[in-house]
């Protein structure tokens, strides 16, 4: 039978960094609240959560990378909101942030979770920050817990 690896959803003993974009703060603050709530409800101690605010979503990957350079975190959550406007700016920002977040995770070997809302309208973004479509910050935190535990299991099995 094949050996199966899965991460569990127990946050006790894990440390998290969270990078939050200040642009659209009325939305990103809800993402941060959802993420912190999920982490704490899953057993992460409040003093094991550190938050860094950045001006906008484009700056998220750099600060996530700098946080991981400190070797203090089991995962970093990246939270922001990019809303489509009348120019191609949305495509550039959304694409580069997603690539940057993925690159940081691949380069460091530490889970870096993409919790950035990309939406066509502000209404869609608000819904995904906790009204009708759940809270993407909460979802990012749960993914972070699972991935941090999975990486630990993979490392301990070698």
UniProtKB/Swiss-Prot annotation:
(2S)-2-hydroxy-3-oxobutyl phosphate binds at residues 86-87, 128. It is an enzyme of class 2 (transferase). CDD domains: Lumazine_synthase-I. Pathway: Cofactor biosynthesis; riboflavin biosynthesis; riboflavin from 2-hydroxy-3-oxobutyl phosphate and 5-amino-6-(D-ribitylamino)uracil: step 1/2. Keywords: Riboflavin biosynthesis, Transferase. GO terms for cellular component: cytosol; riboflavin synthase complex. GO terms for molecular function: 6,7-dimethyl-8-ribityllumazine synthase activity. It catalyses: (2S)-2-hydroxy-3-oxobutyl phosphate + 5-amino-6-(D-ribitylamino)uracil = 6,7-dimethyl-8-(1-D-ribityl)lumazine + phosphate + 2 H2O + H(+). GO terms for biological process: riboflavin biosynthetic process. The active site is at 89 (proton donor). 5-amino-6-(D-ribitylamino)uracil binds at residues 23, 57-59, 81-83, 114. Its EC number is 2.5.1.78. The keyword Transferase applies. Pfam families: DMRL_synthase (PF00885). Belongs to the DMRL synthase family. Catalyzes the formation of 6,7-dimethyl-8-ribityllumazine by condensation of 5-amino-6-(D-ribitylamino)uracil with 3,4-dihydroxy-2-butanone 4-phosphate. This is the penultimate step in the biosynthesis of riboflavin. PANTHER family: 6,7-DIMETHYL-8-RIBITYLLUMAZINE SYNTHASE, 6,7-DIMETHYL-8-RIBITYLLUMAZINE SYNTHASE DMRL SYNTHASE LUMAZINE SYNTHASE. This is 6,7-dimethyl-8-ribityllumazine synthase. It comes from Desulforudis audaxviator (strain MP104C).
